[in-house]
Amino acid sequence: MKKNRRDFIKNIGIVGAGVGLLAPVATMAIESQNENLLLPDDDGSKGEVVLNILQTTDVHCQLHPHDELFWENGKAVFRKTGGYSMLSTYLKKERKKNPYSFVIDTGDMFQGSELSVKTTGQALVPILNALKYDLYIPGNWEVIYGKQNMQKLLGALQAPKICANMYHDLGDGKRGELIFQPYYIWHVAGVKIGFLSYTDPLVPLRQSPAYSKGILYTQPEENLAHFVDVLKNQEGCSYILLLSHLGLSQQIHLANQEACSGVDYILGGDTHERVRKPIVCKYSKVVEPGAFGSFVGKLQLKIKDGKVISDQYFLDEISEKNCRADSSMDKLIQSFEKPFTEEINKIIGYSTEPLYRYFVIENTIDTMILDALKWKLPEVDVVLSNGFRFCPPRVTRDHTGNVPITNGYLFDMLPVDSVVRVAEASGKQIKEWLEKELNNVFAKNASERFGGWVVKFSGMKVIFNAFGEKGKRVQSVEIAGSPLDTEKVYKLSACERQGDPEDVLCRMKGVKNSRNTEYTLHKAITEYLEKNSPVSPVPHKNAVALDAPETLLTQVWGVDYEFK
């Protein structure tokens, strides 16, 4: 593996040259270089011009076409989508059709695959640069390799980066300068389009705290109104787009706050939601274009007499029916994957069931992970696993008639090979923790929703009201078939979160006798598959909502939106 990494670094030398020459970030905003992009015989004020703003988000390093889940006619159906080669073709076609095109990515571009892990994200840099994005913002997972690596990776991308709520942590609670510029201005067709950006301020809670060490996050409301005022009244922007990685619930909440007055659209990310029709809120419209490169959000703004007179939004599917693979992008990807191809494609087991992670409550991917950990740690009462959203489905069967699980797909499911940790907690602690976790997902107040789906568990059965009263959602809990005893001490396991205190396990505070095992998640799952393949990870209905279907696909409610 060391040789493979050396070969890769030699292959990617051009990236290193760019990374080492990062300019210090100024506090001033960025403005586009092509000050007045105009078509021939168009002075930007006569006639009508259509701006074509294209958005990807949460691609999670999914380089190749993959199986994707769609909800159609009341059931899950699957088809092939995504991959940077088809995305490259799509973007080239869009730019050719409309030179007023502007391409953005709203985060989570360096976490989610084995190639990214093996190269600390560096393999993605030349691929992203080849796609010629115009603007980036950091997602919640850009910190996966630490602050310094985040700065180097984003610094090596050949387009501006903006974010108005990530600051250098000077220590002792002292806030330094912004890490990235707060906004960007696109001068086009005689108008100014302002872009302002915010990422998730809850990163230190959602991810291992060590990942974001050296960074201070603030709530968007702290300076949003200020920067909107700057863009409108100082810079003279005709239209303001807020690029965010907050999650759809949080974005809807923000769009209903007075601080968002003056923002025309929120182009969001994080929760992998597929908004096909803009959600109209009090101050702004909100959209989010899915994940894994399966879709591109397309916002078209019609300009006349130096003003935006109308907007249209589309969610374009990236699939073989409308995009052929770009051979030059294919070759570029293969050149960086070559040192690792054999390991990535190595089959480590099989599943008789389609593998997916789209349902809010239980999924086959998480069931397989829990089954593996319960098999490895039979002495543990309850096995816990995070409610991750990332990882596309895998349903295509090979000659065996089963779904192959490769080493690369193991990294797609669990990019962080965390150590398995055990600890003890009382029944009372478990009950209180469950209430908090359920509120994170289903809170009536959208601003209180954060993180992924419902936390996953095995060895415990929980019946709850998803949309019940805060602190009173849990109706019953059983562990090993017996009612939860609030006084009894139970043994739990979960992944270690680097930087957590000794008495915290999977966000549960005050646990006792915590220790790391000799197993990592990957080791436990690999050994489980070696002994038990093919596996049949049918969800065990350990989590049952009385007021929601087991096929619930979104935590967003109270607005005109449906995941499909």
Label the predicted regions:
Residues 43, 49-90, 96, 125, ...:
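Catalytic centers of hydrolytic enzymes
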Residues 3-320, 360, 364-372, 383, ...:
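Acidic, metal/ion-coordinating pockets
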